[in-house]
Amino acid sequence: MCSTREEITEAFASLATALSRVLGLTFDALTTPERLALLEHCETARRQLPSVEHTLINQIGEQSTEEELGGKLGLTLADRLRITRSEAKRRVAEAADLGQRRALTGEPLPPLLTATAKAQRHGLIGDGHVEVIRAFVHRLPSWVDLKTLEKAERDLAKQATQYRPDQLAKLAARIMDCLNPDGDYTDEDRARRRGLTLGKQDVDGMSRLSGYVTPELRATIEAVWAKLAAPGMCNPEQKAPCVNGAPSKEQARRDTRSCPQRNHDALNAELRSLLTSGNLGQHNGLPASIIVTTTLKDLEAAAGAGLTGGGTILPISDVIRLARHANHYLAIFDRGKALALYHTKRLASPAQRIMLYAKDSGCSAPGCDVPGYYCEVHHVTPYAQCRNTDVNDLTLGCGGHHPLAERGWTTRKNAHGDTEWLPPPHLDHGQPRVNTFHHPEKLLADDEGDP
């Protein structure tokens, strides 16, 4: 039976009204057992809401175009709900596993993880339980048949109603051992798990590198580390580090680094060598290289930090060290407008991209955190209208936002030289027009003060 628009509107209005009443209550008159019982009610409601979201997400994904959404589904959810892109991606993937589906003929289909979806819909399991079950299912070897998979999923969903997520994870591990006692995995299974993630920078600038590597990559890393991570090799603490040949006995003896530190320095040296070799060719019209933006004031004071085209905050000491072997460029701005670019090496059109790295730092669409390395150059005034490529009429746009300019969105420059993104009327819900993510200092500056 299909619900009417009026029924849906009334139900959500009633939900909001009921929640408002609950928010206005005080609980001083209750006993401890009664308070615990109410917390169970809250947990049940919290667990049930995703079931509603799954259906909505799947219907939007099936029935909407990118023009109607203003981009890809995950990006739209992240911006509209003000959640991270990774969280939006997780919700889309979870909806695909637990949400209601339809066949190509329009016939309703049960969720892929039927038992888990049912338990969630009744509020018997929460996000933690769902995460354990989904991870278990996606980790199963490809040779496990559908009947066995469905039975294992039913068993885990039943156990999830009685145990905490951490306890359920241990049960899932035991079931995995029973189904695959010999640890037989195919190349397809390993390929599905492969991946490396460079985490966000901590307050000290350090980042965590995590993930899973294939046996082939592991063997390659071992061979490289055996050479470059040996004691005395690639030691940044030495004035003339040994990067070729064999280190002297004295270099090896004076090397006080731990094995993990030597591994780190070896990887850094090898990647730096690859960058300087020129064998990587070009990326977005520029030679593959590290591009750092900083201010003349910070350079003269030897304090502060620079910002790379990938969004990394680089201490000024590292900037100066890298600059010893780099081509230098000086970009001059009047507020948001580019005046000139001076450089120590002759450039042609790539100069405009360097200027945009210095000015925009990343995608100029409001709220977007994609750094400059992964952006395309966008004509604020369509090229078909202006017929020229003026750096003050250019901006950076990521692969998700750049196409929006041809799907009803318009862009323009304001008086400060910043790019404004104007959505079509059906997508306009009062969101910001200018991106300040890459330039948080603008939020702290007075409107009439220094840029």
UniProtKB/Swiss-Prot annotation:
One of its GO terms (cellular component) is peptidoglycan-based cell wall. Residues 415-435 are annotated as: Disordered. SMART domains: HNHc (SM00507). InterPro entries: DUF222 (IPR003870), HNH_nuc (IPR003615). It comes from the Bacteria. Belongs to the Rv1128c/1148c/1588c/1702c/1945/3466 family. This is Uncharacterized protein Rv1128c.
